[in-house]
Swiss-Prot record:
Keywords: Cleavage on pair of basic residues, Disulfide bond, Extracellular matrix, Glycoprotein, Growth factor, Mitogen, Secreted, Signal. Homodimer; disulfide-linked. Interacts with the serine proteases, HTRA1 and HTRA3: the interaction with either inhibits TGFB1-mediated signaling and the HTRA protease activity is required for this inhibition. May interact with THSD4; this interaction may lead to sequestration by FBN1 microfibril assembly and attenuation of TGFB signaling. Interacts with CD109, DPT and ASPN. Interacts with EFEMP2. Interacts with TSKU; the interaction contributes to regulation of the hair cycle. Interacts with TGFBR3. It comes from Mustela putorius furo (European domestic ferret). Belongs to the TGF-beta family. The gene is TGFB1. CDD domains: TGF_beta_TGFB1. Residues 75-271 are annotated as: Arm domain. One of its GO terms (cellular component) is cytoplasm. This is Transforming growth factor beta-1 proprotein. GO terms for biological process: ATP biosynthetic process; cell-cell junction organization; cellular response to transforming growth factor beta stimulus; chondrocyte differentiation; epithelial to mesenchymal transition; extracellular matrix assembly; extrinsic apoptotic signaling pathway; hematopoietic progenitor cell differentiation.
Length: 390
């Protein structure tokens, strides 16, 4: 009588033959990342956001609905909310630079401001408190074809001799002819000219991403409440800030300019390709049918989904979430399967495969009432912008 092992051999042959014919596949069986029902994920995300908002506002429970005054918001509160919302939108529109770009040599380009004799300056209201510097964005795009290639941008100004100390502020030309504060500088008296440099990398990336033709900066004297005279005393080569508010003619090639440091397009071709391959952000995920890890849309209506009326603005927002498998190349027929088996043995509750998690998050500005007093708050990390496998 043959041994028991030999008696079982005919039964095992079909199974062995099936394994031979089956191509190597990712070790999905070793992953503990479970597939979750989409509706269940959405419900859990909504409940998590409910607790997240209350926790960030340090509220044990939602305010009483009867405490919310009827009618529109005060103009000052609405203006503060709108400016906060615009600032967040502007910052989120900035493309994220790629770390790989630091490897390549940078090409340095100088883009001069538009001459003040150009008629585009006629649209700007002259003031003894400020000077204005406008730039043609077509020249910027010629130097830097894509925002992601920009490594650094500096606004360079040649300050002439200064008799008195002055505090100056730099502003960016923004939407609706408004100006957004960027930075400030305390200038000491000096008998010799001095180059001033402002880091405006984020601003120039915004300009390269938008379709505008003319963008610019404003340099203003700091306006203190106890000062009667806030006239700009600083003279910039190529400009004049006289008390009449006139702008002088250009003085040679040392007028204000943008110094751009960028990776040349021909050196960053593979960077461009890899960026699109890895960019699991809303621009890619919302316009594709990607089944692997990606950002999934989720709009939360505060009244409908949370039953809240105490948040006055916005009425809702796109919270989004990350979902999808993260495939990897470890197959069952490789040495890594032994490592994974050992890992699972010692960490039974952990995941051997990467999971889809948020990478970039954005804040959410809100207006809500405490009693009858409206408050504007910015809640951090409320909107999923991109995902990654980790």
């Amino acid at each position: 009588m043959p041994p028991s092992g030999l008696r079982l051999l005919p039964l095992l042959l079909p199974l062995l033959w099936l394994l031979v014919l089956t191509p190597g596949r990712p070790a999905a069986g070793l992953s503990t990342c479970k597939t979750i029902d989409m509706e269940l994920v959405k419900r859990k995300r909504i409940e998590a956001i409910r607790g997240q908002i209350l926790s960030k506002l340090r509220l044990a429970s939602p305010p009483s609905q009867g405490e919310v005054p009827p009618g529109p918001l005060p103009e000052a509160v609405l203006a503060l909310y709108n400016s906060t919302r615009d600032r967040v939108a502007g910052e989120s529109a900035e493309p994220e630079p790629e770390p790989e770009a630091d490897y390549y040599a940078k090409e340095v380009t100088r883009v001069l401001m538009v001459e003040t004799t150009n008629r585009i300056y006629d649209k700007i209201k002259k003031s003894p408190h400020s000077i204005y510097m406008l730039f043609n964005t077509s020249e910027l795009r010629e130097a830097v074809p894509e925002p992601v290639l920009l490594s650094r941008a500096e606004l360079r100004l040649l300050r002439l001799k200064l008799k008195v100390e002055q505090h100056v502020e730099l502003y960016q030309k923004y939407s609706n002819n408004s100006w957004r504060y960027l930075s400030n500088r305390l200038l000491a008296p000096s008998d010799s000219p001095e180059w001033l440099s402002f880091d405006v990398t984020g601003v120039v990336r915004q300009w390269l991403s938008r379709g505008g033709e003319i963008e610019g900066f404003r340099l203003s004297a700091h306006c203190s409440c106890d000062s009667r005279d806030n006239t700009l005393q600083v003279d910039i080569n190529g400009l004049s800030s006289s008390r009449r508010g006139d702008l002088a003619t250009i003085h040679g090639m040392n007028r204000p300019f943008l110094l751009l440091m960028a990776t040349p397009l021909e050196r960053a071709q593979h960077l461009h390709t890899s960026r699109h391959r890895r960019a699991l952000d809303t621009n890619y995920c919302f316009s594709s049918t990607e089944k692997n890890c990606c950002v999934r849309q989720l709009y939360i209506d505060f009244r409908k989904d949370l039953g809240w009326k105490w948040i006055h603005e916005p009425k809702g927002y796109h919270a989004n979430f990350c979902l999808g498998p993260c495939p990897y190349i470890w197959s069952l027929d490789t040495q890594y399967s032994k490592v994974l088996a050992l890992y699972n043995q010692h960490n039974p509750g952990a995941s051997a495969a990467p999971c889809c998690v948020p990478q970039a998050l954005e804040p959410l500005p809100i207006v809500y009432y405490v009693g009858r007093k409206p408050k504007v708050e910015q809640l951090s990390n409320m909107i999923v912008r991109s995902c990654k496998c980790s």
